[in-house]
Regions:
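Core catalytic region of metal-dependent phosphoesterases/phosphodiesterases
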Residues: 1-60, 119, 123
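Active-site-proximal segments of metal-dependent phosphoesterases and phosphodiesterases across multiple
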Residues: 5, 76-79, 86-124, 135
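Divalent metal-coordination and catalytic microenvironments
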Residues: 8, 26, 67-69, 97, ...
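Short, conserved loop/helix-junction motifs that constitute active-site signature segments
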Residues: 13-17, 85-88, 117-122, 142-145, ...
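Active-site environment of divalent metal-dependent phosphoester hydrolases
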Residues: 25-38, 62, 76-79, 99-104, ...
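Active-site-proximal beta-strand elements of phosphoester/diester hydrolases
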Residues: 66-75, 92-99, 149-152
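Conserved beta-sheet core of the metallophosphoesterase superfamily
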Residues: 106-178
């Protein structure tokens, strides 16, 4: 869409103006059912023609400064993935956008995949995209040649299916094979409040200032719901009530995100 092109162009340019920026393709950047179609990133990158913007589109080995990057691209298949033993370099970093076996969703479901952690042995760091929940699947172990494997998660909350917090960037310490999570402040979001027995949860007021509000109610009357809404709207007048559910049980996504 025109909006997508505009936003991505500004994002890539602004990042590249600050620091060398490396991007790889994700499943939403192309049509995996028709591999002859052009991905949406290529024309944007070519049009920007920014000297600090690098698009590692295809599976391969990319030497950048003193780091050896290896890409497993979204068009490739597991049997063709480059193994660490076939790559030379003091620091080997694998970039992959896809599901790794036993990675978790925001609801706590473990996902199956043909891509196993063992297939990444020998790399030093593995930087992942695709799964929106921030998580570290494995810590670095130099003795057993196990890389640190991490999903940095979505940049900001995308919908009600994601926790309000736990979004941002991972700042990597290449030398120590470690990272620091940097939370990106966001005034907008999708807030969910669980009303049980007519009571607000203790931490109900840690909501984004703006965005959409969803109430999930259990054992709660209409009168109690109206009272709760009045309290919430008084503190967060810019939140828009969009959904109301009556449920038998609730799952706290922000608590799940901490696991």
């Amino acid at each position: 869409s025109p909006e997508l092109i505009d936003q991505l162009s500004r994002l890539f340019k602004n990042l590249s103006d600050i620091v060398p920026t490396i991007i790889i393709a994700g499943n939403h950047d192309c049509n995996l059912n028709n591999l002859s179609r052009l991905d949406c990133l290529t024309p944007i990158v070519e049009n920007l023609n920014h000297p600090n913007l690098y698009y590692f589109k295809d599976s391969g080995v990319y030497n950048f400064a003193d780091i050896t990057f290896v890409v497993w691209d979204v068009w490739d298949t597991e049997e063709n993935y480059i193994q660490a033993k076939d790559v030379e370099g003091d620091t080997k970093v694998l970039l992959y956008h896809g599901t790794v076996d036993q990675s978790a969703t925001d609801l706590g479901f473990k996902l199956p995949s043909k891509v196993k952690l063992e297939s990444m042995d020998g790399y030093d760091m593995v930087m992942l995209g695709d799964i929106h929940k921030m998580q570290t699947l494995q810590k670095y172990d130099s003795v057993d040649k196990k890389p640190i494997v991490r999903y940095c998660g979505s940049l900001v909350q995308q919908n009600y299916g994601e926790a309000v917090y736990g979004h941002g960037a991972s700042v990597w310490d290449v030398k120590n094979r470690s990272f620091e999570h940097i939370e990106i402040p966001n005034d907008f979001g999708y807030a969910t409040i669980d009303i049980i027995d007519g009571n607000l949860p203790v931490d109900w007021d840690t909501l984004p200032e703006k965005g959409r509000l969803r109430l999930r109610c259990k054992n709660t009357t209409e009168t109690q719901i109206k009272k709760v809404l009045s309290i919430v709207k008084d503190k967060y007048p810019k939140l828009t009530e969009s959904k109301l559910y009556k449920v038998d049980s609730v799952i706290n996504l922000d608590e799940e995100a901490k696991k």
